Structure formats: structure tokens, C-alpha cells
Amino acid sequence: MAKKVQAYVKLQVAAGMANPSPPVGPALGQQGVNIMEFCKAFNAKTDSIEKGLPIPVVITVYADRSFTFVTKTPPAAVLLKKAAGIKSGAGKPNKDKVGKISRAQLQEIAQTKAADMTGADIEAMTRSIEGTARSMGLVVED
């Protein structure tokens, strides 16, 4: 018989840098999960990813206080900022342009995000990432 699910906890945690301080500690503490056990498991799973990159994680907490977790790919906006070499997006994306990004870079990001995106093909996913780039004030070059 399957374990009874008590809760799903969604967090964004920096890769390889999970520790019991907020947001991890309070979110898992109120579910009764062993926080250090999660931190060690998460850090071990994300040690191959660039340190500090925010990684979305969905933690399934069971009634017996055990847990499993699934890591996702970093948010598209974070990958776009990294590729364009900018600190933040534009405050007024229609008026201000903060950087440029090539179509090849967009396709590379779409390939990275392919596991988490529900697109029909890589072109559709690339267009989705392109929309995110434009909304951040990035100019897409061919």
C-alpha cells in the first residue's frame, strides 16, 4: 500500500547551498520533516549544478514524516540573465532595453528547460523563452 501524502512543499533553493535557515527550515519544520536530512540530500543531488543557481524543488511529505523530492530546472529568467550577462531585467521592458541575446542562446536555454516545459517541440519552447526574454527587456538577435 502506498504511503499517505501529508503535504507538498514547493521551494526555490540555491543549488548546493540548502541549510536550515529560511525558507527551508520553517517550511519543512512545520511539516515535521528532518530538515538536516533534506539539506544533505538536496546538496548531494545538486552538487553537479553551478553553486548558487536557484533550483525549484517539490517536496512530498508523507504522514510518517518521511519525504521525497523532485528538482526542476532553474527558472527561465535566471538562465536568460546569466546568458545575457545582466544583473536584472528592465523596469520598463517596452522602453528600456538592458541587453541582447542570440537565437542560438534561446534554443540552448529551451533545451535545458525541455524536461520541465510542456511544449510540442523545441521551436515552440524557444518562442516561449523568447517571450520571457522580451518581457525582461532583452533584444533578441538572429
From Swiss-Prot:
Protein name according to UniProt: Large ribosomal subunit protein uL11
UniProt subunit comment: Part of the ribosomal stalk of the 50S ribosomal subunit. Interacts with L10 and the large rRNA to form the base of the stalk. L10 forms an elongated spine to which L12 dimers bind in a sequential fashion forming a multimeric L10(L12)X complex.
Family assignment from sequence similarity: Belongs to the universal ribosomal protein uL11 family.
Post-translational modification remark: One or more lysine residues are methylated.
Free-text function comment from the UniProt entry: Forms part of the ribosomal stalk which helps the ribosome interact with GTP-bound translation factors.
Classification of source organism: Bacteria, Pseudomonadati, Pseudomonadota, Gammaproteobacteria, Enterobacterales
Species assigned in the record: Shigella boydii serotype 4 (strain Sb227)
CDD domains in the cross-refs: Ribosomal_L11
SMART domains attached to this UniProt entry: RL11
Keyword terms of this UniProt record: Methylation, Ribonucleoprotein, Ribosomal protein, RNA-binding, rRNA-binding
NCBIfam families in UniProt: L11_bact
Pfam families for the chain: Ribosomal_L11, Ribosomal_L11_N
GO biological process: translation
A GO term, aspect molecular function: large ribosomal subunit rRNA binding
Annotated Gene Ontology cellular component terms: cytosolic large ribosomal subunit
